């Protein structure tokens, strides 16, 4: 491992803000495998993953990124052993409940994407409380993808557009539909 001789402040000054992405997405993958390699249970790795999210969020805010998406739980994750699913859901509830004050203090607006209706009731409730509590923050937006897949996203987009066409919110002309997708 090579270390950098420059202090963080000097590195931050070297960042070209005009070339900085506005949105960064991170797929949370490998935490369980890492834990097993270290001789721990998979859930230990997931709990350490929370620290990685904190660090990524702090760094993203510090350099001026406006949106950070964390792909935390995909629809495929329901195929894991039940004890691991339960542990992940408990970790989600615990983390959200314990981080909401810190999110507020740091100007972080929390939102979510995915089929959150498919999550356990306690997860939905804690998530919604945190979303509501941070809704007026705008330094950076943390988007948590939960019960998410690309297929779900496509189905959801088609359903939303179809409903808007039916209610005449958007015109069913080709150009109007294309603009709705962008």
Which residues are covered by each model-predicted region?
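Flexible, compositionally biased loop and terminal segments
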Residues: 5-182
């Amino acid at each position: 491992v090579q270390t950098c001789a420059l202090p963080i402040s000097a590195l931050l000054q070297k960042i070209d803000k005009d070339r900085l992405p506005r949105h960064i997405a991170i797929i949370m993958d490998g935490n369980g495998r890492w834990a097993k390699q270290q001789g721990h249970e998979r859930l230990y790795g997931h709990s350490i993953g929370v620290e990685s999210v904190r660090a990524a969020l702090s760094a993203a805010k510090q350099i001026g990124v406006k949106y950070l998406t964390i792909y935390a739980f995909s629809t495929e994750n329901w195929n894991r052993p039940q004890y691991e699913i339960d542990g992940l859901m408990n970790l989600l509830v615990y983390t959200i409940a314990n981080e909401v004050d810190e999110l507020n203090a740091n100007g972080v607006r929390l939102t979510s994407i995915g089929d959150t209706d498919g999550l356990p009731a306690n997860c939905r409730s804690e998530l919604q409380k945190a979303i509501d509590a941070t809704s007026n923050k705008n330094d950076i937006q943390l988007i948590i993808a939960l019960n998410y897949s690309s297929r779900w996203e496509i189905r959801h987009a088609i359903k939303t557009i179809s409903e808007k066409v039916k209610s005449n919110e958007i015109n069913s002309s080709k150009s109007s539909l294309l603009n709705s997708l962008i």
